[in-house]
Regions:
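Core transmembrane alpha-helical segments of multi-pass membrane transporters/permeases
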Residues: 1-13, 207-246, 262, 266-279
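Hydrophobic transmembrane alpha-helices that form the pore/transport pathway of multi-pass ion
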Residues: 18-84, 282-320
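Hydrophobic alpha-helical transmembrane segments in multi-pass membrane proteins
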Residues: 29-30, 84-93, 120-125, 158, ...
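Hydrophobic alpha-helical transmembrane segments
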Residues: 31-33, 42, 100, 110, 159-160, 164-173, 181, 276-278, ...
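Residue-level recognition of pore/gate-forming positions within transmembrane alpha-helices
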Residues: 39, 81, 100, 116-117, ...
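Membrane-embedded alpha-helical segments of transport systems
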Residues: 41, 73-95, 111-127, 317-320
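Long, contiguous bundles of hydrophobic transmembrane helices that form the permeation core
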Residues: 111-223
């Protein structure tokens, strides 16, 4: 809901324009802007599909125009948008589920997930640079790149709700639900104040704000439907596996295959994640695999002399 409201208010377009202003003039600038824009959009959106639609509509045509093939342009956009789910503080619904699974605060999840998310985007940035070098591509023309200072200050109000969210999570240590709630309320009022100041007619400004808010609520509800159904279905699977004793038998089979070899066990976990990922969204996939494999990984690791923190195991499952 928070991401949908921010996107409806123009936050997604702002982050994309800011990305183009920052890296558009570099070699292969559109690809780097797509990666940076998707990463910043991932700050507010936990949906890879919404991220792809928001940024890809603008970045893919520009990447093709500057020399990238349509396949590479699509691959760069999709990979950077999918990685948006790894970017704190939102991280999709999986981060909230992970916090309840492990029994730690949401802040702990965000703290441990921040560096891997940055590393993933640095890797994408580097790969896009190598592709641009290989194709001998140049940056965008000065006339096509927005002014950085002007672009940054044009949407400064979009950063306020994000700072509210981070402040409440990090410094006040509020729960994720409370933090998101107050950040959403601040977003609604900040957008109202901005439109009231920007618009010439207060009545028209209020009408625009009201329409944006309603559309944001609708998009947020639609985004939650798919996630809710997937999590509910995954919960049924997890409950059935636990109640029938299949989990115990599965653990015995996996341990007999791995034979206390942690590397083999990690590889089997990756394969299971990838297979389930063909038909399940990220959150549902994480719920199923974490319920089956997280404890096994910790136990086998301890038996082999390795100490696997539970949060590291859950993040491993989440990433694959």
């Amino acid at each position: 809901l928070f991401g949908a409201l921010l996107e409806t208010a123009g936050g997604g377009k702002y982050f994309l324009d800011l990305a183009f202003a920052m890296v558009g003039k570099m070699r292969g600038g559109p690809a780097k802007a797509a990666i940076l824009g998707s990463g910043m959009t991932g700050l507010i959106s936990g949906s890879s599909i919404a991220n792809t639609v928001t940024t890809g509509t603008f970045t893919i045509p520009i990447m093709k125009k500057t020399g990238f093939s349509k396949e590479k342009a699509g691959a760069i956009e999709v990979s950077s948008s999918v990685n948006g789910q790894l970017m704190p503080p939102v991280m999709g619904a999986a981060a909230f589920v992970m916090a309840s699974f492990i029994g730690v605060t949401y802040f702990e999840i965000v703290k441990h997930a921040f560096l891997p998310a940055i590393i993933s985007y640095v890797a994408l940035f580097y790969i896009s640079h190598l592709e641009a070098l290989k194709l001998n591509l140049k940056g965008m023309d000065d006339a096509e790149v927005p002014n950085l200072k002007k672009t940054f200050f044009s949407g400064l109000h979009f950063l306020i709700p994000i700072f509210v969210l981070i402040y409440m999570l990090v410094y006040l240590r509020f729960t994720a639900s409370y933090s998101i709630f107050y950040a959403t309320i601040s977003l609604i009022f900040v957008n109202l104040i901005y439109l009231s100041i920007k618009g010439e007619n207060l009545k028209n400004s209020f009408k625009i704000w009201f329409n944006q808010t309603i559309v944001g609520f609708e998009k947020g509800a639609l985004n939650m439907v798919g996630v809710g159904i997937a999590i509910a279905t995954a919960g049924i699977i997890v409950g059935a596996v636990g109640s029938t004793g299949l989990s115990t038998n599965l653990i015995i089979v996996i341990e007999s295959i791995a034979k206390d070899n942690v590397s083999i066990l990690l590889f089997l976990t990756i394969i299971l994640c990838l297979l389930l990922g063909m038909g399940l969204p990220t959150t549902a996939n994480y719920v199923v695999v974490a319920s089956l494999m997280a404890t096994v990984l910790v136990d086998v690791g301890n038996a082999s002399g390795f100490i696997f923190p539970l949060i590291a195991v859950h993040l491993f499952v989440f990433y694959f």
